Swiss-Prot record:
This is N-acetylglucosamine-induced protein 1. Disruption phenotype: Leads to increased resistance to the chitin synthase inhibitor nikkomycin Z. It is found in: Cytoplasm. Pfam families: DUF3605. N-acetylglucosamine-induced protein which plays a role in the N-acetylglucosamine metabolic pathway. Keywords: Cytoplasm. One of its GO terms (cellular component) is cytoplasm. InterPro entries: DUF3605. One of its GO terms (biological process) is N-acetylglucosamine metabolic process. Induction: Expression is induced by N-acetylglucosamine (GlcNAc). It comes from Candida albicans (strain SC5314 / ATCC MYA-2876).
Length: 254
């Protein structure tokens, strides 16, 4: 059975993602024509997708079922990524150094975690606006993913970066984010994209849990867009932060 048909069991809110992933991906790698190849530049084998790129239905299934390990690059994209990793090695740069210096133009000292520990189980309090994700425009930067997965030409992959660390759900065994954090991200994307004419049918997003993160010290989410005009995305990136969350947004989602 086509795994993508399972997508009908998931809603657009992406709040019903399971906490863990399947133990074995062999059947998915076979179905999606993915092979594993080891490189001395990578700690784990690289996943190479042969044949056609992931379709939009494939992307929806992978993200909404939270089986993010399935994503892979084409061979050409993998070669390009390995060349980049070699360049980092030759220049004695970490991926974090590169992102801060060449892409985000942030100082490492600007990265921070929430400063106030709340007595309750709540992760956020409007009493401490500096600890609210996607609230302070200066905390946010939107960039194209320089090394996207193997998607169709009408699909764009952007990353939304945050100086403020997006908290991990303390009850998650795999380092996933909480339902409240997912609601906040949904609201931010609704204001940034949907309110400007982009349908939810054109948007999916995910945040890698800890075991999948190649960049751990700089929090970010991945947003995948289908059939969205280049000009819209370029203007969004040049604008910097998107439509940030207000204190009222936080109140309404509590």
């Amino acid at each position: 059975m086509n795994p993508a048909t399972i997508i009908t069991n998931f809603n657009n809110s992406q709040l019903q993602t399971p906490p863990t992933s399947p133990v074995s991906f062999d059947k998915y790698y076979t179905y999606y024509n993915i092979q594993l190849e080891q490189s001395t530049l990578m700690p784990q084998p690289s996943k190479i997708k042969n044949g056609d790129p992931f379709t939009w239905s494939d992307i929806q299934f992978i993200i909404k079922s939270n089986q993010l390990e399935i994503f892979a690059r084409s061979r050409q994209q993998t070669i390009k990524y390995h060349k980049f990793k070699q360049w980092l090695k030759d220049n004695k740069l970490s991926i974090n150094d590169y992102l801060l210096d060449y892409e985000l133009h942030w100082k490492e000292s600007e990265l921070r975690e929430q400063q106030h520990e709340l007595v309750s189980d709540k992760e956020y309090s409007i009493d401490y606006p500096e600890d609210l994700i996607f609230h302070n425009p200066n905390d946010i930067s939107i960039l194209y993913n320089k090394f996207p997965y193997y998607f169709e030409p009408n699909v764009k992959h952007i990353c939304i970066w945050s100086k403020l660390k997006i908290p991990v759900d303390k009850n998650s065994e795999v380092g996933d984010i909480s339902v409240m954090t997912k609601k906040l991200i949904n609201r931010y994307l609704e204001k940034t994209f949907v309110a400007k004419g982009i349908s939810w049918d054109q948007i999916v997003w995910f945040k890698n849990w800890l075991s999948l993160q190649s960049v751990r010290s700089i929090s970010h989410i991945h947003v995948i867009l289908k059939d969205v005009d280049d000009k819209f995305v370029d203007e969004l990136i040049s604008g910097g932060s998107g439509e940030v969350l207000t204190l009222d947004d936080y109140r309404n989602l509590e």
